């Protein structure tokens, strides 16, 4: 690809992303569409100002065994509970997704476990390149398959990058 063609491709991609300035009124209008996903814990939801926001990136971090994966599982079930048309994408980099746990949580939340499992789209990422590819494919779930993806869980976002890019 020549430099001129490459530049045209980059400019077309930028145009399609609508990057640039918007008015404060437009930001307010978009913020009105933001919803909160409950954790089911009143104290945790209070700490998170009502729950985890949609259209946002929220990182949970902590020591091994501190409950990060459980938060992802809980948010997945609660997203499905709160919106009967919602789908959840779960990008699993460390093979920690447990359908058995989803069943337990769904039963506890009064959600049909089969429905919950059918609306959680799980992909196992085997390295950082595969993780990036899967991330790019989420858009296709929405645009091509018409799925109302309301939550994307990446467990763990940094695991492959830490392992593959040591010291960088």
Pin down the residues of each PLM region.
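Helix-hairpin-helix
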Residues: 1-10
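Conserved inter-motif catalytic segment of the P-loop NTP-binding fold
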Residues: 83-168
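General structural signal for secondary-structure boundaries
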Residues: 2, 23-24, 127
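The Walker A/P-loop phosphate-binding site
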Residues: 9-115, 119
């Amino acid at each position: 690809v020549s430099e001129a063609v490459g530049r045209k491709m980059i400019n077309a991609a930028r145009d399609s992303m609508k990057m640039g300035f918007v008015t404060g009124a437009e930001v307010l209008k978009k913020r009105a569409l933001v919803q909160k996903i409950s954790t089911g814990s009143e104290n945790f939801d209070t700490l998170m100002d009502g729950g985890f926001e949609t259209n946002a990136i929220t990182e949970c971090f902590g020591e091994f065994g501190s409950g990060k994966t459980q938060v992802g599982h809980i948010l997945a079930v609660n997203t499905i509970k709160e919106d009967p048309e919602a789908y959840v994408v779960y990008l699993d980099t460390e093979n920690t997704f447990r359908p058995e746990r989803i069943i337990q949580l769904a039963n506890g939340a009064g959600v049909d476990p089969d429905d919950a499992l059918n609306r959680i789209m799980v992909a196992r990422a085997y390295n950082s390149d595969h993780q990036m590819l899967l991330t790019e494919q989420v858009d296709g779930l929405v645009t091509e398959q018409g799925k109302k993806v309301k939550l994307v869980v990446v467990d763990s976002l940094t695991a492959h990058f830490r392992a593959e890019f040591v010291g960088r």
